[in-house]
Design a protein with these regions (language model features):
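Transmembrane helices with small-residue packing motifs
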Residues: 16, 24-62, 106, 120-129, ...
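Solvent-exposed, non-transmembrane alpha-helical starts
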Residues: 20, 59-66, 103-114, 144-147, ...
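Solvent-exposed, membrane-proximal periplasmic/extracellular interface segments of envelope transport
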Residues: 5-7, 62-138, 196-217, 238, ...
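Helix-loop junctions and hydrophobic alpha-helical segments within the transmembrane domains
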Residues: 324, 331, 335, 410, ...
Length: 1015
């Protein structure tokens, strides 16, 4: 009668086919490795949409009530909505739609469609004259390649012509996605009028505008069917240059005026300026290039570099092309570094195998590694997983685990060969005795990573490939151990294996002595272990908490926030002062400056800032990590001492979901003045803590407004309306569009405005002469009064409530999460004293960390259920399930021993490692308990079964622990993986020792096993 199916026995009977499978797997794995995409970090979805609307001429309050509030109300109908945030300026509304962090990436396109549909449904409710709404759901696009074009002796228009030329030519690069220009300034033809002169001539500026628009209009003149052909009729008159404008003769009030005689015509750039861009302090135009999704960044980078080199070689002298950001180079360095770490880990694991198992047995284990890696690479290619920080780190972590099964199989084969079995018998016995305990251990280990795989947050999406790669590697390693390793083993292992000496060595004797002491003094052993565990729990308070560490890239971000009523020109002057201190700094490779907006998203986790005239951001590339640290300290000191009154923040690039300033508190309520008052009080309270850095508000101070109160009855008698006066004032102060001039590929706006002397001072507005429809001129003060008042220029709201966010950096080495814990009693006390309807909420690092860890906590019960189910299938005993599971929490002892002395923080990734540690620990425990069962079935006394099983499984358990822990050494020095590696190394080492000492003591105590009396 045949026994149960034995996969190893089947493999030995079909060796040719198995060798063929191994060859195909290796070959396909090599090709997959070559085809895998390369990235610096895994992508994750930015679950944010921006809705922008303009209502020219409206006040901030009108825009808030009639536009922003209507949009926010409608968005509340979204099922997946987390919250709505908005800011409203006079005539401008910007609404941010944030989806719940657990929203799946595949659901988001449909949700954005629903947002557009809902807002379109209320278009009829918006006021007249509204422009938009416009939708931006491509907020997360990454422009990995950014070039700066500078022009020595060239105007901005001339430089832009060359940039446009390059932009058009690079379209042929394979894989090219979006291309954006940064810092370009649109040309404008200004018609600067003297209002006094126009009034003296009795000319209404609106007449001038109407005449120019009529002449420049593009109107069809018809088509003539002339027999066999069609002839289009064209009229002349369209403006092609400022000269055409200057020569226009206008008929106004039955007289002809040459435009150049009544207006000063100048070609310039839009004023006030749009966001500006600089490179190393020199005005520049940036060209930001994104790759299409799913491409290979290294291949794309090579093709782009080659094409850019061809194009820049043809540019004239004076045009400089500089690299601002090169993602392909960054990825090549990052992947190269991680690939080197992977090979280091392979060498370490192989050394462990050869030293512990011997050359032949170690060679069998060595052969299993490329087989597993090949099949994992194959899976990665077909599932769309690229080689990046997370997937390569997962491979390194998996490497120490995937050799476990092969080691156990080979060690069992060697043991049976020592007892005189043939190679085939040894291989089939290894399957019978270890295959299913190994499978259970593998499934339990994989279950430990389930919270990562099922975490739907942005952080979970960022780390998902950790679960996918490790899970597949573990499952494949079991297949290799039971299918391929026996076949390799029968060819490599020697049939004439000499038995090991029955007498244990010095280490073996010491271990046996410790084991027997623990079993004989079981309650002491259990008590000491429990005491150590309680001590470890207590010491967890000394472990600093962290969300994600800073990136190891050399860039530094410097934010400058001027008072919110500051002009773009004032911001530029502040930047000039800072850039003057950067020139010649030995720690700086290069820098780029964005004035009036934040840096374009050249790096996915960038906390991108919107356009604001009072804001600037510098991206400084240091010459290395040491230079980055020194430069950061110098900049912080300089900004604090020399840039008083300007909010500044210096930071390295972030990893994981973007946060910005780590300490954030939101104060919200109904009344803006009360919200401002409470926000200032809270900021004052925060400033008392010595660890709090510079504090800023996202909005606070009111701005000055010049209000013109029109006497409506007098205005109507003169034939004027409020609309007429508002349009006239706008054309005088800011300028109003008149028409456009076609200039090559550009459409240049012609803008009419008052001359500099008349629009440069608020006082001059009071003396303006207004031309009435009857042609007479009258001073503004004849029917209006002018006065100053304060108005809120900007209002941020969250979930339809005015909300001020207080933001601060952290001084010293304290982690933001720990600082928030320190502050919490004071915050609670402050919040308790607020009126009803006003509240304080914590944001920043703590909030983002909570969003990431919340989904993990919700999946932990499923993880425990899966582990318990797999264990019950293997053990068939609730009592043994308890014994095996009891060792898992004890890994915390090793975690604390590793983290506290080294000062390593506990971050999001370290938490994932600790959860995974549970499965790894249980894996060894279940193998030991299963071995005890086998010895008892073979007739051993219970005491002897525990002793023999522990001694028998000691070597493979220690070997797998050594491979798993030592294999993580290459990533322990990485900023990102270091905390996880330290936690897992410490946990594995201590838990392994406890598995071999505490578990036997607990086993004999639980089953009340006594040591038999010996004769």
């Amino acid at each position: 009668m045949k026994g149960p199916f034995n996969l190893s026995e089947w493999a030995l009977r079909h060796q040719s086919f198995v060798w063929y499978l191994m060859f195909v797997a290796l070959l396909m794995g090599v090709f997959s490795y070559m085809n895998l995409g390369r990235e610096e970090d895994p992508s994750f979805t930015i679950k944010t949409m921006i809705i922008q609307t303009r209502w020219p001429g409206a006040t901030q309050e009108e825009t808030l009530r009639q536009v922003t509030d209507r949009i926010e109300k409608k968005l509340e109908e979204l099922d997946s909505l987390d919250y709505v945030k908005s800011y409203t300026r006079p005539g401008e509304s910007t609404v941010f739609v944030y989806l719940r962090d657990t929203t799946g990436a595949k659901e988001i396109p449909e949700i954005w469609y629903q947002v557009r549909k809902k807002i379109n449904d209320i278009r009829g409710d918006f006021p007249e004259g509204l422009q938009g709404p416009g939708f931006n759901d491509e907020f997360g696009d990454v422009y990995g390649s950014v070039y700066a074009f500078t022009g020595d002796g060239l105007s901005m228009r001339q430089l832009r012509d060359y940039v446009e030329q390059v932009r058009a030519e690079i379209r042929e690069v394979p894989g090219l996605g979006k291309v954006e220009m940064v810092g370009e300034q649109d040309e404008v033809l200004y018609l600067n009028f003297s209002t006094r002169k126009l009034a003296a001539l009795g000319i209404d500026q609106r007449q001038v505008v109407q005449s120019l628009q009529s002449q420049n209009a593009v109107t069809p003149a018809g088509v003539i069917d002339a027999g066999p052909e069609r002839i289009s009729v064209r009229t002349s008159g369209q403006f092609q240059s400022e000269k055409d404008l200057a020569n226009v003769n206008l008929r106004l009030n039955d007289r002809f005026y040459r435009l150049a005689d009544i207006a000063d015509i100048r070609r310039g750039y839009v004023d006030p300026a749009t966001p500006m861009f600089r490179f190393n302090g020199t005005p520049a135009i940036g060209l930001a290039i994104a790759m299409k999704k799913g491409g290979n960044i290294q291949d794309f980078g090579k093709a782009l570099h080659a094409r850019m080199n061809e194009l820049t070689a043809d540019l004239p002298v004076g045009v400089g092309v500089h690299t601002v950001s090169d993602q392909a180079e960054v990825v090549e360095e990052a992947v190269g570094g991680f690939t080197s770490a992977l090979f280091e880990a392979v060498i370490i694991v192989l050394l462990v195998s050869f030293v512990s198992l011997g050359v032949r047995a170690g060679l069998v284990v060595a052969c299993s590694i490329p087989l597993v890696l090949a099949m994992v690479f194959l899976f990665m290619e077909y599932s769309g997983i690229t080689m990046q920080r997370i997937s390569l780190g997962a491979l390194i972590i998996a490497l120490g685990l995937l050799v476990d099964d092969a080691m156990i199989t080979v060690e069992m084969m060697v043991t049976r060969l020592e007892k005189g079995d043939s190679k085939d018998q040894a291989a089939t016995f290894a399957y019978t005795s270890t295959a299913f305990p190994m499978l259970t251990g593998t499934l339990v280990t994989v279950a430990g990573f389930v919270p990562i795989g099922l975490n739907a947050s942005s952080a979970g999406e960022y780390t998902f490939t950790l679960f996918a790669v490790i899970a597949v590697a573990m499952l494949v390693s079991w297949v290799v151990a039971v299918l391929f390793a026996p076949v390799i083993g029968v060819h490599i292992l020697s049939a004439d294996v000499k038995p090991h000496s029955a007498e244990p060595g010095r280490i073996g004797r010491a271990f046996n002595g410790g084991l027997l002491w623990a079993m004989r003094n079981r309650w002491w052993a259990i008590g000491i272990t429990v005491l150590l565990f309680v001590l470890a729990v207590f010491c967890m308070r000394f472990v600093q908490n962290q969300f994600f560490p800073s990136s190891d890239r050399p860039e530094i971000l410097v934010d400058l926030n001027l008072p919110q009523n500051a002009s773009m020109d004032e911001t530029r002057k502040a930047v000039d002062r800072l850039e003057a201190t950067l020139k010649g700094d030995p720690d700086i490779e290069r820098w780029s400056t964005y004035i009036g907006e934040g840096a374009i998203r050249f790096y996915l986790p960038l906390d991108q800032q919107l356009q604001n005239p009072y804001y600037a951001q510098l991206v400084i590339v240091s010459k290395g990590l040491e230079s980055r640290t020194a430069l950061t300290e110098r900049l912080q000191k300089r900004l604090r001492e020399e840039f008083v009154g300007i909010g500044s923040y210096v930071q390295a690039l972030e990893m994981g979901p973007p946060v910005g300033r780590p300490i954030q508190y939101r104060v919200s309520g109904k009344d803006i003045d009360l919200v401002r008052k409470h926000a200032i009080e809270l900021a004052t309270e925060l400033d008392k803590n010595s660890h709090i850095g510079e504090i800023i508000y996202d909005w606070n101070e009111p701005g000055k407004v010049l209000r013109i109160d029109i006497a409506q009855d007098k205005a109507r008698q003169l034939g004027l309306s409020s609309d007429d006066v508002a349009r006239l004032m706008n054309s005088i102060v800011s300028g109003s569009p008149v028409t456009q001039v076609n200039d090559d590929i550009y459409l240049i706006n012609v803008v009419g405005r008052a001359e500099d002397a008349e629009r440069g001072s608020p006082e001059t507005l009071q003396n303006l002469q207004i031309v009435t429809p009857s042609g007479t001129s009258i001073p503004l003060l004849a029917f209006a009064t002018v006065r100053y008042e304060l108005e809120q220029p900007l209002v941020w709201r969250r979930d339809r409530k005015p909300t001020i966010t207080i933001k601060a950096a952290v001084r010293d080495e304290i982690q933001p999460t720990d600082l928030v814990k320190q502050l919490q009693p004071d915050i609670d006390k402050f919040a308790a004293g607020l009126p009803v309807g006003y509240k304080v909420a914590t944001g920043g690092t703590v909030e983002e960390s909570s969003k990431a860890q919340g989904p993990i906590a919700s999946v932990v019960p499923l993880m425990l259920f899966l582990m318990a189910t797999f264990l019950m299938i293997q053990l068939h005993s609730v009592q043994k399930l308890f014994l095996v599971a009891s060792v898992a929490p004890l890994g915390l002892i090793g975690v604390v021993l590793a983290l506290v002395p080294t000062g390593t923080p506990m971050g999001f990734v370290a938490i994932l490692g600790i959860l995974a540690l549970i499965g790894i620990i249980i894996r060894n425990s279940v193998i030991l308990v299963t071995q005890i069962d086998e010895y008892e079935r073979d007739g051993y006394e219970p005491w002897d079964a525990v002793v023999e099983a522990t001694e028998h499984r000691r070597r493979p358990i220690l070997l797998t622990a050594a491979a798993a822990s030592l294999g993580m050494i290459p990533i322990a020095r990485e900023v990102f993986w270091g905390p996880m590696a330290y936690a897992m190394i410490g946990g594995i080492i201590i838990a392994t020792l406890l598995t071999l000492l505490f578990l036997p003591a607990l086993y004999v105590a639980w089953y009340k096993i006594r040591e038999p009396k010996r004769d």
